[in-house]
Swiss-Prot record:
One of its GO terms (biological process) is lipopolysaccharide transport. One of its GO terms (cellular component) is cell outer membrane. This is LPS-assembly protein LptD. Residues 1-39 form the signal peptide. Together with LptE, is involved in the assembly of lipopolysaccharide (LPS) at the surface of the outer membrane. It is found in: Cell outer membrane. Residues 767-786 are annotated as: Disordered. Keywords: Cell outer membrane, Membrane, Signal. Component of the lipopolysaccharide transport and assembly complex. Interacts with LptE and LptA. InterPro entries: LipoPS_assembly_LptD (IPR020889), LptD (IPR050218), LptD_C (IPR007543). Belongs to the LptD family.
């Protein structure tokens, strides 16, 4: 018996107009569409349907799939210029043929569909779309509902993720999995000549798992192979997936050429590990591991660097960083912060290779603690230790510390509270005083607040008890056990006036806010107390209204002074935004301050403090300015100044200019500062951005630090290059050493993103820096509806 012709010319509607093809095809094979056939034959079914009918149109925030009910079979729809077949058995269609069933759409010049086996054979300009994945090729054979079959010479596109490519053959395993033989893959959206692509002998794609695997894969960029691997995995979208990340490069003046090859392990949705072998040409191979974890009750990061047998230092080098936060519930918590390096020159030699260590860092905190916070109570119990590198002086460690705070507000108009602290201070420096200290600091205040004024009297008390188990040889006759009791009374008051003004054609609300702050603390001899945690407080607008000129609990300054200040603000009445602020303040002394930090210092003899002046402006078009001055009227000298300007008219457009000046002071043993700083991020073209930072020491006639970089943002890739000169350690004379490094970072959009320190350097060096934008999100599968 001769084979049955595939497209017999027996259908009477061959010459029907195009708009009638669908109806003719459905009438010819009614068994394929029982729901529609029943609607045509039954009068009741032809009546208007209720609102829950699946055929009704309704408003929806977004297009969504409507799955079939359990046991229901999707109907099959066929459109073609010519169709023929047997009811409920098979169908042949040719001429712009289309077959639709469920989520599957098949288009071709000719289609044969066997309903018994659910097998479709398509020939000539075949296009298959299934759940957002599109295939195009000359021939395909597919089981529609199971989505199992193959296509020759396919071109494919994942609408949900944006990936695409071609191959010699594709085998469709199910709705989510497919296997390509001798193919390519790219996430570039261009139709021809993608900037990057992966070529492999086999690709296994799983859109459900959002993962692709390439066998014998070679990564090409601009037609040049840059990486090869017998096996590589990569995400099909921006979601995290295990696999190789793009290599990163750097050049350092002390370490030579650096090449990093990171591999990312997506252990779980809330845990991941990045393992990075780093080849350092002059030193060897360093391995870095970064483990991150997150849960509703805890989170943290652990990073370790290890360099065996450093070829320059001739020893093993390592650095450890661990940060952990824990929530036990009920207000209880805990934390760990541990940072350690192997030796004193690690920051100078290898700080540029570690984002948690910089070249000038000399103090490494090692601390663990328990916390409790509930209402007015706040409790901290911790063990704190420091690793100190020269030339820094080791600070005291708290081994351990227990701190309890209680604070209540507006209890009958009163604010009151107390702080109790026990600390055992230890230090690694030889011949240094050590011991225990108990501190109790209660206070009570009564605030009266009105629409245009406030009055806040306050009484506080400082009690300290020392039990020293070792005395320094410089204080051999000091007592080991003693106590201190020091009261303090303060009175803070101010007025607030406002008026409407019009300046430069714009309406403002101007305020005038005079403020007086008086504090009295009697003199108590504190020369026996060691300096466990106390130091001179900075002097500025943030500190001028504080009762104590020292920080810490070992020194409470005697005081009989008043601070007078005046603030004026200009506020936009439409938005409430503060557009300008001007401040001037000064302290006036009724008695000399006799308490000093060290016994060898002389008492402060002055009638008034330096004058503090500050201003902040926020003008239109992104212009901002902040300025502060500290002026000594007795010597007619500028003690400190800080001037800063910022201009940011749009995204990735920012310019910062600053100047800092500090006059040297032999009493405070501080070094003079006279520095000029400029930093910027600005587009040179639509795709090319320049980044720069220049910090110049006018007094020393040297560059403190500098950064010059370029970033190019293409459609599916980005390239950044930067040259950075930064401080890298401190020499024996106390001066900073500098080193230069070159960094290059290539980002293949849609494949993976990793920062080798370039973006971090740009962000740290340029306030207001904005990274390049991410690639646009892939379109919904409904955007390319077939």
């Amino acid at each position: 018996m001769p084979p049955k012709p595939l497209f017999p010319n027996v259908f009477p509607g061959d010459g029907a107009p195009r708009k009638r093809r669908l109806a003719l095809a459905l009438l010819a094979v009614p068994g394929l569409v029982p729901a529609v056939s029943y609607a045509q034959l039954s009068g009741a079914a032809a009546q208007p349907q209720p609102l829950d009918s699946p055929w009704d149109l309704r408003l929806a925030p977004q297009l969504e799939d409507r799955p079939l009910k359990d046991g229901a079979k999707p109907a099959a729809f066929v459109i073609a210029d010519h169709t023929s077949g047997t009811a409920e058995q098979d169908l042949a269609a040719k001429g712009s043929a289309e077959l639709r069933r469920g989520d599957v759409v098949v288009k071709a010049d000719a289609i044969h569909y066997d309903q018994d086996t659910d097998m479709a054979d398509a020939y000539g300009q075949v296009r298959i779309n299934n759940s957002g994945t599109s295939f195009a090729g000359p021939e395909a054979h597919l089981k529609i509902e199971a989505n199992q079959g193959f296509m020759t010479a396919p071109k494919y596109h994942f609408n949900m993720t944006g990936g695409s490519g071609s191959a010699e053959r594709v085998d469709m395993v199910d709705n989510e999995r497919s296997v390509f033989v001798n193919g390519t893959y790219t996430a570039c959206q261009c139709s021809t000549n993608p900037a990057w692509y992966i070529k492999g002998s086999r690709f296994d794609f799983d859109t459900g798992a959002d993962e692709g695997t390439a066998r014998n894969g070679v990564l090409f960029f601009q037609g040049v192979p840059i990486f090869a691997s017998p096996w590589m995995t990569f995400p099909l979208s921006g979601e995290r997936r295990s696999g190789l990340l793009p290599p990163t490069f750097a050049m350092n003046s002390s370490n030579g050429f650096e090449l990093s090859l990171p591999y990312y392990f997506n252990i779980a949705p809330n845990r991941d590990l990045t393992l990075t072998p780093r080849i350092i040409s002059r030193r060897g191979v360093m391995t870095e591991a970064t483990f991150r974890y997150l849960s509703p009750s805890y989170s943290g990061t652990f990073t370790a660097n290890y360099l065996p047998d450093d070829r320059l230092a001739h020893r093993n080098r390592y650095a450890i960083y661990w940060q952990h936060q824990q929530n036990f519930g009920g207000g209880f918590g805990g934390y760990v912060y541990y940072n350690k390096v192997s030796d004193t020159t690690y920051p100078e030699d290898l700080g540029s290779t570690n984002q948690f260590v910089n070249g000038t860092q000399t103090l490494y905190q090692q601390e663990a603690g328990l916390t409790y916070n509930n209402g007015p109570w706040s409790v901290l119990a911790r063990y704190q230790h420091w690793q100190t590198l020269p030339p820094s002086i080791a600070p005291y460690s708290r081994e351990p510390q227990l701190n309890v705070k209680y604070t209540k507000y507006n209890v009958g108009g009163f604010d009151f509270g107390a702080e109790a602290d026990y600390s055992r201070f230890r230090i690694t420096t030889a011949d240094a005083t050590e011991g225990d200290r108990i501190v109790f600091n209660p206070y009570i205040a009564y605030g009266v607040y009105g629409p245009g004024y406030f009055v806040v009297p306050k009484v506080q008390y400082h009690f300290a008890s020392y039990d020293l188990n070792y005395l320094s040889s410089t204080t051999p006759n000091s007592p080991k056990r003693f106590t201190e009791s020091i009261p303090t009374v303060s009175f803070d008051t101010g007025l607030i006036f406002d008026r409407s003004v019009r300046l430069f054609g714009q309406d403002f609300i101007q305020t005038l806010e005079p403020r007086l702050y008086y504090v009295y603390t009697p003199y108590r001899d504190q020369s026996n107390a060691p300096l466990f945690d106390s130091a001179e407080s900075d002097f500025g607008l943030a500190e001028i209204y504080q009762p104590n000129t020292f920080v810490g609990n070992d020194r409470i300054a005697d005081a009989n002074r008043i601070t007078a200040g005046l603030t004026s603000r200009f506020i936009d009445p439409r938005t409430g935004d503060e557009r300008a602020r001007f401040v001037i303040a000064q302290q006036y002394y009724f008695a000399d301050q006799r308490v000093t930090l060290n016994s060898g210092q002389s008492a402060v003899q002055a009638r008034h403090s330096d004058l503090i002046v500050g201003a902040a402006l926020k003008l239109g078009s992104g212009f901002m300015s902040e300025t502060a001055f500290q002026y000594n009227q007795n010597n007619n000298q500028l003690v400190k100044s800080s001037v800063g300007f910022g201009y940011s008219p749009g995204e990735r457009r920012v310019i910062n200019v600053g100047y800092r000046y500090t006059r040297s002071n032999t009493t405070l043993d501080n070094q003079p500062i006279n520095q000029f700083l400029i930093s910027a991020q600005w587009p040179l073209t639509r795709r090319l951005y320049a980044i720069g930072r220049f910090n110049y020491d006018l007094a020393g006639d040297r560059v403190v630090d500098g950064l010059v970089g370029l970033q190019y943002d293409a459609d599916c890739w980005a390239l950044g290059v930067g040259v950075q000169r930064a401080a890298n350690g401190i020499n024996s004379s106390g001066q900073q050493n500098s080193s230069t490094r070159v960094m290059m970072q290539l980002t293949l959009k849609g494949l993976s993103t990793v920062d080798n320190g370039l973006v971090s350097a740009f962000r740290a060096g340029v306030p207001g820096y904005t990274p390049l934008p991410p690639p646009p999100p892939p379109m919904s599968r409904f955007s390319n509806y077939e």
